Amino acid sequence: MQIWPAIDLLGGKCVRLQQGDYARETVYSADPAAMAGDFQRQGARYLHLVDLDGARAGRPMNLDAVRAIVAAVDMDCELGGGIRDEATIESLLELGLSRLVLGTSALKRPEWFREMCNK
């Protein structure tokens, strides 16, 4: 079994939204890299990251936090939120992310999504 703990990023912090409402957030940590390290020390081998600002803006917004997380841990990390074009995909993979999660762009542009999957 694979278990992927998740870190939702909003304004560079680790948060949870109540029922997806950006106005009702709970901040769990102001240091996402430290939280990722805690997950690794507890035995996690994988990490799921969600850029909530990126999901709203249509482009990744928490890149400093993502860079810090990838540098701080020795785990496969995946990211979703605001990934809408090939240049973004390439730059995120260059950061050291193992996987990317595409939702909106995959649904709205299935031909493009197929092309990206076949690269």
Residue map of PLM features:
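Hydrophobic transmembrane alpha-helix bundles
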Residues: 47, 85-94, 118-119
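Catalytic beta/alpha-barrel core
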Residues: 47-50, 76-84, 98-109
